[in-house]
């Protein structure tokens, strides 16, 4: 490296002191289109061993278009210093052009000989052949032993069950958008799965049920990650070794392999993320031919992939941000190109709005439309949604139902919180434990329909039965003082000055009394928030609040999950803060009163925009509410890049078939080192260029690849990693894998570039001509051998645990935190 640095300084001195002055001449007339492509490098030619830039042969009849008022550089400057415009009709990979004789006569005589094996046609054939081998190897590793183990592994219990729900058209709730589960259900349906397997818990055997279609679909999409990464790096770096090294890192990573072999959302998500990244890079590379068929194809495919990524998980927002930043940079450069009219810039802006905003948005909304249309039967997710939403679900108690319109004394009702994913006012015979306020009956909110959700509304000062036929019907009105008696336990809704179980400065809410007899702390004043229906309380439509008469607090739910003594239901409190919030607003859902006439609820069904909005509100609240349970394993974001601890997919004992999600440590630690090296080398080069240091022409192409292509990948890694530090929800190891894809691609580009720089610096010596090939080959062999050592983690293992000395995996437990 010292020798390389010496050569660099010598070349710089030669360029600075002895370069002949530039010839001057008249500027060429005519309109010029100067195309600057953000994050993209024009195609250079390099010596495959030394990394030195070479010049292709010069066709005699080709003219060059120069910047206004500038002439070609001196002969010694090389192509890196010329201001050439690619001929219209060619994409950037074919855009390198030579200088014609009438502009620079000496150029034709200055041809650099290139080996026959590195000709463009042979090189392209080698790229395609390698891509075919990479693709076959990727599919072979992902489909190998796909049927093992023949039982549920980890989150297959969730996403396999949700695939069954789609086949059975049963409505359910999940914190993720529906596309991934829809595709899993479709794959199961097309492969003969009938949707009858229960997917109850990990370890349950599939028996005669067809599960290979769903696993095969996920493995199919996971297998395309490697070819996509290969093509992305090849386009960013124009380097076959960099692309091959990237493909090897991902092919031989046990973590990516494991995630791709099971019924999970991760391979589907990563497929769309990588497809979006590849499409973005491809349409950037065709930016010299705007509005052509390939340009439109890749731009549209980028938008489709963005819709797919967001339709699987909200993590897809990160790749949307990356494409958005690239688009802003692209448009900014086009806007600064004075050779382009504002009409042309407007066309570019319109094309990107159509393909990157309108098209993904239409597809995303269509995904939800199909989701709502297919899932039309009542299921376990009903309680997460509003009463009006439930009225559209076949089999729900509100579907095609007829109930009394106005609330009256003596009615049996359910009271539902207006905030999404809070549920129904609920009580049961269990008491609050010692030390948690008064030891009285628990009152909670519960997300599912249950007989313990039923309450009887009564006057505060009367114990007579309002349903007695001899008594006239009396409607409940705004401002009335009432009691709510729990139908199952006959205890009254009650509050007092004891502190709530979880929320400070809120009061405890309990069930109190015997057979409806209690005290003045059972009295509540009912207030109608939206009084456009009058003073009467309308079922489903009226929004009400319950004000405690003694303490003056308002009944609400904090949304916090109670410990096991509260059956992990949600806390109900009486808050002294009387500000109107959705947590303290309720509506009457079910209403039973034989003395009142019924009306149909069909008119209350929501429109599709209302369904779409409510679905997202419920998903967001559900995502934020994912908290770790007692003794549940979680991980922290700083654990992930260092491969600190894996995740047990299947089995725990030495007699079990064990699958352990853990990244290949050689790959992951190499990625981590590469990120650090990139930050150091990239910063050094950027500072040097900013200070005006002129690099030799042979190095300018390499530094552009490192800064532009590597910078794009570093941005992708940061966008898919750092946001997790800000999330309050429960996190798992598998959340890092989209970021890991970007770090692996960055590793391929970085090491290829560094080895080429070493080869250039050591070029006179025999080592200089071999160091690049030897370095790349060493990395490939090391990665392949590490996969040979760690492949049982992905394909399964039986026998003693790694902690046991006699275990064949004992020597591979490099960290104490690895539990396989």
Swiss-Prot record:
PTM text? N-glycosylated.
EC number(s) recorded for this UniProt protein = 2.4.1.109
Q: Identify the enzyme class.
A: transferase
Q: Which PANTHER family match?
A: DOLICHYL-PHOSPHATE-MANNOSE--PROTEIN MANNOSYLTRANSFERASE, PROTEIN O-MANNOSYL-TRANSFERASE 2
Q: Which CDD domains match?
A: beta-trefoil_MIR_POMT2
The record's account of tissue expression is: Ubiquitous. Highly expressed in the acrosome of cap phase spermatids, in spermatocytes and liver. Isoform 1 seems to be testis-specific.
Function comment: Transfers mannosyl residues to the hydroxyl group of serine or threonine residues. Coexpression of both POMT1 and POMT2 is necessary for enzyme activity, expression of either POMT1 or POMT2 alone is insufficient. Essentially dedicated to O-mannosylation of alpha-DAG1 and few other proteins but not of cadherins and protocaherins.
Provide the catalytic activity annotation: a di-trans,poly-cis-dolichyl beta-D-mannosyl phosphate + L-seryl-[protein] = 3-O-(alpha-D-mannosyl)-L-seryl-[protein] + a di-trans,poly-cis-dolichyl phosphate + H(+); a di-trans,poly-cis-dolichyl beta-D-mannosyl phosphate + L-threonyl-[protein] = 3-O-(alpha-D-mannosyl)-L-threonyl-[protein] + a di-trans,poly-cis-dolichyl phosphate + H(+)
Has UniProt tagged this entry with the keyword Magnesium?
no
Encoding gene (name): Pomt2
Supply the name of the protein.
Protein O-mannosyl-transferase 2
Q: What is the species listed in this Swiss-Prot or TrEMBL entry?
A: Mus musculus
């Amino acid at each position: 490296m010292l020798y390389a640095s010496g050569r660099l300084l010598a070349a710089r001195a030669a360029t600075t002191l002895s370069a002949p002055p530039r010839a001057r001449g008249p500027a060429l007339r005519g309109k010029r289109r100067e195309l600057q492509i953000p994050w993209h490098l024009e195609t250079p030619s390099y010596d495959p061993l030394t990394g030195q830039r070479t010049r292709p042969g010069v066709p005699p009849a080709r003219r060059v278009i120069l910047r206004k008022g500038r002439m070609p550089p001196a002969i010694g400057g090389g192509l890196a210093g010329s201001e050439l415009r690619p001929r219209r009709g060619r994409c950037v990979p074919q855009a390198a052009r030579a200088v014609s004789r009438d502009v620079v006569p000496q150029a034709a005589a200055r041809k650099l000989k290139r080996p026959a094996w590195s000709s463009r046609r042979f090189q392209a054939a080698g790229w395609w052949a390698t891509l075919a081998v990479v693709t076959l190897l990727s599919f072979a590793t992902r489909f190998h032993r796909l049927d093992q183990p023949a039982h549920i592994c980890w989150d297959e219990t969730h996403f396999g069950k949700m695939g069954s729900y789609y086949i059975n058209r049963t409505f359910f709730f999940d914190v993720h958008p529906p596309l991934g589960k829809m595709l899993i259900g479709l794959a199961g349906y097309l492969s003969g799965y009938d949707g009858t397997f229960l997917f109850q818990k990990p370890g349950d055997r599939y028996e005669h049920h067809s599960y290979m279609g769903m696993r095969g679909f996920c493995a199919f999409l996971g297998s395309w990650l490697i070819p996509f990464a290969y093509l992305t790096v090849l386009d960013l770096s124009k380097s076959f070794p960099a692309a091959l090294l990237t493909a090897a890192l991902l092919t031989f990573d046990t973590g990516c392999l494991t995630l791709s072999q099971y019924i999970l959302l991760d391979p589907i998500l990563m497929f769309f993320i990588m497809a979006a990244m590849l499409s973005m890079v491809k349409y950037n590379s065709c930016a010299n031919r705007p509005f052509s068929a390939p340009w439109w194809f890749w731009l549209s495919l980028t938008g489709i992939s963005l819709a797919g990524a967001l339709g699987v998980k909200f993590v897809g927002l990160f790749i949307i941000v990356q494409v958005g930043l690239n688009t802003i940079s692209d448009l900014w450069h086009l806007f600064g190109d004075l050779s382009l009219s504002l009409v042309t810039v407007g066309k570019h802006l319109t094309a990107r709005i159509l393909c990157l905003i309108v098209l993904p948005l239409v597809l995303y909304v269509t995904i939800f439309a199909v989701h709502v249309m297919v899932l039309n039967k009542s299921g376990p997710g009903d309680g997460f949604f509003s009463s009006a939403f439930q009225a559209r679900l076949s089999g729900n108690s509100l579907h095609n139902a007829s109930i009394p319109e106005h609330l009256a004394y003596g009615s049996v009702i359910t009271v539902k919180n207006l905030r999404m994913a809070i549920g129904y006012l609920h009580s049961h015979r269990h008491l609050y434990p010692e030390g948690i306020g008064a030891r009285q009956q628990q009152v909670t909110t519960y997300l599912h329909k249950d007989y313990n959700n039923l309450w009887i509304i009564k006057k505060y000062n009367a114990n007579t039965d309002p349903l007695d036929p001899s008594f006239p019907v009396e409607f409940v009105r705004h401002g009335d003082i009432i009691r709510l008696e729990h139908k199952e336990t006959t205890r009254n809704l009650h509050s007092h000055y004891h502190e709530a179980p979880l929320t400070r400065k809120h009061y405890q809410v309990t069930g109190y009394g015997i057979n409806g007899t209690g005290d003045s702390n059972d009295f509540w004043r009912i207030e109608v928030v939206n009084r456009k229906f009058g003073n009467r309380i309308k079922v489903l439509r009226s929004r009400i609040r319950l004000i405690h008469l003694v303490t003056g607090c308002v009944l609400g739910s904090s949304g916090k999950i109670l410990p096991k003594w509260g059956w992990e239901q949600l806390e109900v409190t009486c808050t002294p803060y009387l500000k109107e919030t959705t947590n303290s607003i309720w509506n009457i859902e079910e209403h039973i009163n034989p003395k009142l006439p019924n009306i149909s609820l069909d008119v209350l069904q929501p429109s599709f925009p209302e369904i779409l909005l409510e679905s997202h509100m419920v998903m967001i609240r559900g995502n934020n509410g994912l908290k770790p349970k007692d003794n549940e394993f979680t991980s922290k974001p700083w654990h992930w890049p260092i491969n600190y601890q894996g995740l047990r997919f299947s089995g725990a004992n030495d007699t079990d078939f064990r699958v352990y999600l853990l990244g290949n440590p050689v790959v992951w630690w190499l990625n981590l080192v590469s990120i650090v090296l990139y930050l150091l080398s990239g910063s050094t080069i950027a500072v040097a260029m900013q200070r005006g240091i002129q690099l030799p022409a042979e190095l300018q192409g390499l530094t552009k690849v490192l800064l532009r292509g590597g910078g794009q990948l570093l941005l992708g890694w940061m966008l898919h990693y750092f946001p997790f530090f800000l999330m309050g929800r429960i996190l798992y190891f598998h959340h890092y894998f989209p970021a890991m894809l970007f770090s692996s691609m960055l590793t391929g580009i970085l090491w290829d570039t560094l080895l080429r720089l070493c080869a250039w610096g050591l070029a006179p010596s025999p080592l200089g001509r071999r160091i690049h090939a030897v370095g790349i080959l060493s990395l490939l062999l090391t990665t392949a051998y590490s996969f040979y050592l760690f492949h049982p983690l992905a394909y399964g293992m039986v026998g003693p645990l790694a902690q046991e000395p006699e275990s064949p995996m004992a020597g591979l437990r490099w960290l104490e935190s690895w539990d396989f």
